[in-house]
Design a protein with these regions (language model features):
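Active-site loop/oxyanion-hole signature of alpha/beta-hydrolase fold enzymes
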Residues: 6, 10-17, 22, 54, ...
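Conserved hydrolase catalytic core segment
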Residues: 93-136
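Glycine-rich, phosphate-binding/catalytic loops in enzymes
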Residues: 49-52, 76-78, 116-119, 126, ...
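A generic fold-level signal
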Residues: 6, 14-16, 26-27, 116-120
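Short, hydrophobic alpha-helix immediately C-terminal to the catalytic nucleophile
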Residues: 46, 87, 111-115
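Helical cap/lid subdomains and adjacent loops of hydrolase enzymes that gate the active-site channel
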Residues: 1-2, 127-149
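Conserved HGGG/HGGXW glycine-rich cap/lid loop of the alpha/beta-hydrolase fold
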Residues: 22-69
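Conserved catalytic-core motifs of eukaryotic protein kinase domains, centered on the activation segment
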Residues: 44-46, 70-76, 135-137
């Protein structure tokens, strides 16, 4: 996408998938990971990343599986999978605990990761946070015509 390039770009391996990421800012600075929302990619942060880096952070962003330049796996994509992807990214690439800032879906992934791996996440900035009821399983419903009496 034109105008969405920023920072150094590379890939990392998560399970059997290739995942895209980018970063900017000095390596010795505190780490801040930006997570995009549904239908976006790490390029979403093009107008923010350099300013955040100038404020004193090493800024990272990755494309969640199924988005941007990361692999598009077949099958079900869900918050737990994306949280495992973020955990892998924090361990393999960032290499130290980080602040996670997410937009919509990215907020949910950041919060989930903070719950399961508080050793990797210093804090989460959720802007905005989607409705948490989206995590609840939907009740199994059957059409009235398929019910048996």
């Amino acid at each position: 996408m034109a105008g969405s390039d920023w920072g150094h770009q590379s890939w990392f391996q998560f399970e059997s998938w290739r995942c895209h990421w980018r970063c900017t800012g000095a390596a010795d600075r505190p780490a801040l990971v930006l997570l995009h929302g549904f239908g976006a990619s790490s390029g979403h942060w093009r107008d923010n990343a350099e300013a955040i880096a100038a404020a004193g952070y090493r800024v990272y962003a990755m494309d969640l599986l199924g988005f941007g330049q990361s692999d598009q796996p077949g099958g079900r994509l869900d918050n737990r999978l994306w949280s495992r992807q973020l955990q892998c990214f924090l361990e393999q690439i960032v290499g130290k605990p980080a602040v996670v800032a997410g937009n919509s879906l990215g907020s949910l992934v950041g919060l989930t990761t903070a719950v399961f791996r508080p050793d990797l996440v210093i804090a989460v900035a959720a802007a905005p946070l989607p409705d948490p009821t989206l995590l609840s399983p939907l009740p199994l419903r059957r059409s009235p015509w398929s019910r048996r009496w």
